[in-house]
Amino acid sequence: MNHLLYSLSDVRDFFDKRDFRLCSFDTETTSLNYHTLRMMGCSFHNGDSTCYINLRGNPERDSITAYLKHLFATHIKNLVMHNAPFDLKVLHKEGITDVTDNIFCTMTAHHLIDENSNHGLKELSLRYLKVEGIRTFAEASKYGFDSPEFVEYACNDAIWTWELHKIFNKKLFELEINRLFFEVEMPFQFTIMDLEINGVRVNLERLEELRIAASAKRFELKRKMYDIAGLGYTLQADMFTGEAEMVSKHKLGNQQRAQIIKSRGLDSPYKTDGGDISVGKETLIHLRGDEFVDALYLYNIVDKLLSSFVEKIPSMIDDDGRVRASYNNTGTVTGRLSSSDPNMQQNPKVNPVLPFDFKGIFEADEGKSIVSADYAGQELRLLAIVSGDETLIDAFKQNLDPHLMTGNAVFGLGLTKEQMKRTSDEYKELKELYDHERHIGKNGYNFPIIYGTTSYGIARNTGVSEEEAQAGIDKFFNTYPGVRDAINKCTSFLKKCWHVRSLTRRRRRLDPNQKKSYRQAFNFLIQGLASDMIRRACNLVREEIKRHPEWEAKIIMIVHDEIVFEIKNEYLDVATEKIKFIMEHAMDLPLDMEVEIGIGKTYSEAK
């Protein structure tokens, strides 16, 4: 039976008579945005009894919330939720911050169990519980928020979450991913909560300067493409902004772009389903060097950054001047964290081709600084650990430059180990002298091989023939034979088991009948481990921050292998020293990680 509770006395009476030390919990809110949302109501289920507490327009709202605060602090010892970070931040917004650490998120549990599927509550309930006739929030709310239909809708979320948790808990132990779930993933739910509560301050002046500069670059590139293609246009000023804009009867959609590329005597192995040249990123990289293609490639980058990042951010800024991205813990099959609204992962570095300081729009509050703590060369260190290659492990232990090492092997430079040590007298000079060879070692072989790039791909990236690229690959594997052995071992395991596991036991299921699966499998061994390392590091640093409230430190962003903080200036030295040590020793591995610390008033200065 579902109980609708509205008065404080009814709420007290319901919980006083029942054991809710272990229960599932779900919230209904007015918004998904932390800064503006309010909890409309919440539902609880303990396996026997279910209730929905309606707080919408409730005159006893404050008293009931105070009682719930007491309930969470003193009675509830184990809490089950679906998409735990969201429900946790809703509670936080209502002032309910003393919540048990013993939580179970069914969304994250399912992501570990079946990384290739949808993890929504309704989809999982249909799949595992065979529930039918599931209403949406919009459908249920039409009946009124205290109607039997809406109460059933709200209570079902708690009931289904409870039932799914029983299924998934058993499965986690069967698949031997229970430790990863309880020791890494569940503490990380609180880190995600912090990220989405804290947000980061945006400098609106810099944002507008950036928009104007990037818009001008986009306009310049568009005009250049029209000129190269011989397409007519006229210029006029936008009636609202005064900025120049092009008017032309000629469109420059994908079909027209493909026709222009063909008319320039170019072709590409990348085709559309209809057999035409694809004008995607692969084709543009393949055909680089042509002035139209190069202009189009840059235009696409600038246009995407403007349309999906710069021009969208103003509408995402809350009235306290901060933007709060949504972090998705279950959005990638490798375990990597993703973000949206805005996507913090697509924040490019300033470079000569695109001289725009995207990171400069994010700044610290007065009296504080932005701190960037970035795992330096993490993927190569993890490659050494995953492969067990003695040469690569020894290189990191002796502080050798792995990119110069690979360049040395591929080009036969004849450098000694001593010369390639970062601390040696000759290193700086040799690094500059062999900058090209080092660059090829880094971007032509070290990183591409992690991603399973073939000789064709390396040839395309480095501008050499496939034969030369293959010779370079052979030299790479002769230098690091443990890497070749690890790839072969991964291939054999995938063929036999149809899945691979990272060192943290995270799984990636792939079809061995597809060629790309083998590249993805080995890359996952590194990406899966990296994703859990950043989680573990965040969890440990979060606990340290809680022990030092005087730091006034906040985790404000996670970007790939980097954790970004905002810290009070007086405590920067002691805080960054602790953060660096914790991150470098976050996991018990044969090699310690290296963390680079950057500090600045803006995110750009910290990088």
Explain the meaning of each model-derived region:
Residues 32-33, 42, 85-96, 110-113, ...:
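Short active-site loop/helix that positions an aromatic residue
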Residues 1-55, 116, 127-128, 136, ...:
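Conserved "right-hand" nucleotidyltransferase catalytic core of DNA-directed polymerases
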Residues 480, 581-590:
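A common structural junction motif
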Residues 45-47, 84-144, 164-167:
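Metal-dependent phosphoesterase core characteristic of DEDDh/y 3'-5' exonuclease domains
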Residues 24, 76-87, 370-372:
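Acidic beta-strand-to-loop metal/phosphate-binding motif
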